Amino acid sequence: MSGARGVLGVGLDLVDVGSFAEQLGIVGSAMATETFTPGELAEADAVSRERPADPLARARRLAGRFAAKEAFTKAWSAARLGRAPALSTLRWLDVEVLTDPWGRPFLRPSGDTGAAVLESLGAVEVHLSITHDGPVAAAVVVLAEAGAPSAVDSP
C-alpha cells in the first residue's frame, strides 16, 4: 500500500447522542458556544430546521462534529508518539468541522492549534469521515503528509 507511508496518525471517537444532547441541554451550560464555532452551530441549526420531526437532529449533528474534534486530537497525538504534546491546552473552537457544498465534512485547525500542528508535523492533510447510526455518532481522522503519494497515484 504505497499511500500508507504518508500516514502520520489515525484517530477514532464515538459519542452517545442522547448523553450529548443532555449535556447540551443543561441550563446555563456554555458547552455549545465554548466547543463549536458559529459556523458549526449554524449548520447544526439548519439541519434541525430541515428535520423538525427529529428532536435529536441538532444534537446528532453536533455529536458527530465533537467526535471529529476528539478523533483529530487522537490522530495528532498518535503522530507525536514518544514526544510531548505540542500544545498544553487545545481550544475546541480552533478545530472547526464544516461541510463543503456537497455535504462532505472537512476539518480545519486554526489559531494556536493550527500553528502548533504546522510546527509539530509540518504541512498535513486532514482526512475526515463522520457517521451516525442509531444512538451513536462516530468519526475517524487520518493525518497524512501533504502531497503524500496515494494508491490512486500508483501505477
Please place each PLM-identified region on the residue numbering.
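Core catalytic alpha/beta fold that binds nucleotide/phospho-ligands
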Residues: 1-155
